[in-house]
Amino acid sequence: LEEGKGAVVPVVADALDTSNDGKLIHFSGEATTQDVVTDLDFAIEARALKLRRITKMYQWEEEKEERKEKVSGGGEKTVTRYKYSKVWSELHIDSGSFNRKGSRGRSNPASIPYESDEFVADKITVGTFQLSSSLIKKIDAFEALRLPAEVREEIGDRTVHRTGNGLYIG
């Protein structure tokens, strides 16, 4: 690390200097792209470095609660209680693993129809430097995208509803 610190060459991102080829360089600037990234499932596109879709499904969740109770004769027994509630979750909850006795009528779909996903511009640059895929993976500053006035009204056989700056399918 110390060796690298002494060998680093500060450069201006807007100027390419071939005398720095093969050297450890340092620059800063704004990452930009001319690409349009698209979420094909929802027909949403934006000129952005990345477009992140966050999806959640309303589904049953099981909560297991155990407590010890004294029994006549001086022993103890474990009493298990199961509670069920509906929650919004980005991850699929497998209701097949629920306690069968207490979960009657509480089953979740086999999968989330549209999972969370991330769409990335093909070419991202800072000045004259194109960022590597390993650097692009580290970009994690997101802001809400203002949805276009027109959004799909149906996806498959389901109606799409606008909810604030999001979509609800149901």
List PLM regions with ranges.
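Alpha-helical transmembrane signal-anchor/signal-peptide segments
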Residues: L1-D17
